[in-house]
Amino acid sequence: MQIKRSGFRAGLGAAFEKAFEQACGSWLGATPSLPILASGMIGSAQGWREAHYLNVPVDMFEVGNHLTQLKTSTGKRIHIVPGLVRRGRLVNVMRGEETQILGALIACGPSVDLRKVLIGLPGTHTKWARVSGTAVEDFETFMTGEVYAALCEHTILGCTMKPTSSFHAEAFDRGLRIAQGAIGQMGVLSNIFSVRTFALTAGLSAEEQGDYLSGLLVGHEINTLRAFHD
């Protein structure tokens, strides 16, 4: 049986609305006049309502003029913040991080010199945005967090690791130093195998290996930033 796309979208919209009411219903009940803003994947092509990307460079204080509006079945109006896209040398996108960047710019205030700033947003897909004044001029994405999880869970590197809630700063720093030193020039694909070799030669304990790998990956991320941004 084929499901008509229009019917599928209607069902998806109802599911989004139900989730929205569960998450925000009590807030809106207490303050019904509160404006509703949403950002992130809710505005993607697979989200509740698509909010088309804005091209960079873009003044972040102009983003509010490009909100996408939708109305729920109960009459609530939701405004969705658009993501950003960089076209040209290699297409790059962000959704949700643009709102965090705007918050950072507001938090900095007039006392901070924003003529040339690099804003880092760590996460599964880390973003680094080059900002001048109130405008996002360019940005990069690094899949550091997701690659770390994949290496730990789906490669031989994870076989000797022991998950722990403790942070082993010395192991992390060791990974950073190796990535940013002469050996780091061999590249991340070569360096990460040292997690395995240190495990086999008692160079790292099972508890330290994850933080060491994290340091390696973050170190190579920073190396790339240094190569492309002053």
Label each residue range with its predicted role.
Residues M1-A15:
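Short glycine-rich, Thr/Ser-proximal phosphate-binding strand/loop in the N-terminal lobe
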Residues Q2-K4, M60, R226-D230:
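Short, intrinsically disordered, charge-balanced linker/junction segments flanking boundaries
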Residues F8-G11, V85-L118, P122-G181:
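Glycine-rich phosphate-binding loop plus the immediately following alpha-helix
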Residues G11, A15-A19, R95-T99, F142, ...:
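Conserved active-site and cofactor/substrate-binding residues in soluble primary-metabolism enzymes
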Residues F20-P35, C108-V112, I222-H229:
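Phosphate/pyrophosphate-binding loops at sites that engage ATP/ADP/AMP, CoA/4′-phosphopantetheine
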Residues G25-V91, G133:
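Short beta-strand-loop/turn "lid" adjacent to the catalytic site in phosphate-handling enzymes
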Residues L37-I42, P122-T124, D230:
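Glycine-rich beta-strand-to-loop/alpha-helix junction loops that act as flexible
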Residues I156-D230:
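ATP-binding/phosphotransfer module of carbohydrate and carboxylate kinases, centering on a glycine-rich
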